[in-house]
Amino acid sequence: MRLLEERILADGTVLGETILKVDQFLTHQVDYRLMKEIGRVFADQYADLGITKVVTIEASGIAPAVYTAEALEVPMIFAKKHKNITMTEGILTAEVYSFTKQVTSTVSIAGGLLSKEDRVLIIDDFLANGQAAKGLIDIIHQAGAKAVGIGIVIEKSFQAGRQLLEDLGVEVTSLARIKHFDNGIVSFLEADA
């Protein structure tokens, strides 16, 4: 997605050899116009797959996920990183390692929000090692639902996440695919959409 790549080049900051800071439009401050376009592109990509729910993990995946759900006209669910006292029965959980934060979290979705009839599109802000999406796939399977696709805003293609998810049999669509960082400069591969 050329618009996203241009925004990364204009407002993204490379930190070290593996981190891209995009807090100007995605991970802290949200550019709703860009997120709306991202949602439209994901919805167009998966329009024929009978998606019934969009799922993400809080927090930075919420903006692109909600706009994708709006474009598909389906509900959006976000997995919580901290258990809420209102989540009492049938909680679906998975352990997820965050590459950026270097911590493992237990993420959860309340029971009853997903069912065996659901065809789920996962949306997330970044794909690095694939553990966040893998955890969501696990939760979706616990509910008996089917993960039919994964939409990624920014993929770090120099890490193994895509291969992990494709090996699980789930289609990955990334709107910006980073080949590498070179002296603070982002180099892209061809995006999926």
Curated annotation (Swiss-Prot):
It comes from the Bacteria. Its EC number is 2.4.2.22. CDD domains: PRTases_typeI. It is found in: Cytoplasm. One of its GO terms (molecular function) is xanthine phosphoribosyltransferase activity. NCBIfam families: PRK09219.1, XPRTase. This is Xanthine phosphoribosyltransferase. It comes from Streptococcus equi subsp. equi (strain 4047).
